[in-house]
C-alpha cells in the first residue's frame, strides 16, 4: 500500500454507537429517552479521532462490513479528518455496534456491544506497515490482537512510540503490554493484571513490563504515573459530567500527544485530564473532544 506520513495511527475496535441519556437506567421496565445520538465509537477509534482534534494527522486501521453501520463508521472518521486509507471493508459482513445508556444525574453509563461477524485483520496481507513505520505514535486498545502485535514490532523497529490503552484482559494482552512504550491502564486492569488491589503496588508491578511510562487512570480520583521510582498523582478536574463514554479513550491519546512534546509526566497527566474533562461535558464519546486551543484555554483558567 502507498502511504503518506501520518502522525498518529490507531489499530483496534471501531463501532457504530447508539447513545441515550435516561433519567435512570431501567431494569425490566420502560423509560423515556431525554436525548439520543448515533456516532462512531470504539476505544482506539475514538482515541484516534481525539488525536485529529488535537491537531495531529491521524489514520485508523481496522475492519468494517459494507452494511449501513460500517459505512457510517467510515463517514464519521472522514468527517473528523481521520484517514481511512488502511481500513479493510469486508463485503457481506456485519459491522460492530454498541448501545450506551447514560444516567442523567451522574453521566455514568452501561454499554452493550457486539463485534459483528467480522474476521480480524490478517497481519500478513491486510496491515499497512509502511503507514505505521512513518508515524510518531501507534495507539492500541488490545483488539485486532495479531495485527496489533505485528504493528507494535514494526513501530518499535522504526522508533515509533507505542501507546497501549490497557482496559480489558484479553488473549494476547500480556504480549502487547510488554511491547508498550506508554502503558496506562484502568484500575480494573491494573488490579487483575498484577493480582493486587493496592494500586500503589500495582503500578510498580506494571513497570516490570519495561514500558517507558506506566500509569493508572482512576476516574473521578484522577490518575497516577511512575516517574523514576516515584508515584506522581494528578487529580481529576471537578465537572458535572453529561456522559463519561470515551473519557478514558481520549485521556490516553492526550497523554501521548503531550508526551511527544514534553516528558514532564505531571504536565502530560494534567493535559490528559483536561481533555477528558472537556469530553465529558457533552453526549457521546466524540462530541465533546476539544481542540488544542480549547484545551489550552481550559488549562489557563484552571
Regions found by a protein language model. Name each.
Residues 152-233:
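Conserved phosphate/ATP/ADP-binding segment of small-molecule kinases
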Amino acid at each position: 500500500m502507498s502511504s503518506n506520513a501520518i502522525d498518529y495511527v490507531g489499530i483496534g475496535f471501531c463501532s457504530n454507537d447508539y447513545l441515550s441519556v435516561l433519567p435512570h437506567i431501567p431494569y425490566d421496565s420502560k423509560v423515556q429517552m431525554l436525548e439520543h445520538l448515533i456516532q462512531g465509537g470504539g476505544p482506539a477509534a475514538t482515541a484516534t479521532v481525539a488525536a485529529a482534534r488535537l491537531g495531529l494527522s491521524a489514520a485508523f486501521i481496522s475492519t468494517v462490513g459494507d452494511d449501513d453501520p460500517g459505512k457510517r463508521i467510515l463517514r464519521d472518521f472522514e468527517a473528523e479528518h481521520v484517514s481511512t486509507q488502511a481500513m479493510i471493508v469486508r463485503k457481506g459482513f456485519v459491522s460492530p455496534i454498541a448501545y450506551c445508556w447514560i444516567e442523567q444525574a451522574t453521566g455514568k453509563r452501561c454499554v452493550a456491544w457486539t463485534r459483528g461477524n467480522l474476521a480480524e485483520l490478517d497481519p500478513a496481507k491486510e496491515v499497512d506497515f509502511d503507514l505505521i513505520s512513518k508515524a510518531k505514535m501507534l495507539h492500541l486498545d488490545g483488539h485486532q490482537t495479531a495485527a496489533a502485535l505485528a504493528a507494535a514490532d514494526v513501530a518499535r523497529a522504526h522508533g515509533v512510540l507505542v501507546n497501549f490503552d490497557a482496559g480489558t484482559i484479553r488473549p494476547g494482552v500480556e504480549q502487547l503490554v510488554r511491547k508498550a512504550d506508554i502503558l496506562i491502564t484502568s484500575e480494573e486492569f491494573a488490579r487483575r493484571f498484577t493480582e493486587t488491589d493496592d494500586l500503589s503496588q500495582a503500578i510498580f508491578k506494571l513497570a516490570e513490563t519495561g514500558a517507558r511510562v506506566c500509569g493508572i487512570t482512576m476516574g473521578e480520583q484522577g490518575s497516577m504515573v511512575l516517574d523514576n521510582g516515584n508515584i506522581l498523582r494528578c487529580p481529576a478536574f471537578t465537572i458535572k459530567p453529561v456522559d463519561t463514554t470515551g473519557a478514558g479513550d481520549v485521556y490516553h491519546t492526550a497523554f501521548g500527544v503531550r508526551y511527544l512534546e514534553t516528558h514532564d509526566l505531571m504536565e502530560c497527566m494534567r493535559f490528559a485530564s483536561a481533555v477528558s474533562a472537556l469530553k465529558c461535558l457533552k453526549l457521546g464519546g466524540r462530541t465533546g473532544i476539544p481542540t488544542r486551543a480549547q484545551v489550552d484555554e481550559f488549562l489557563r483558567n484552571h
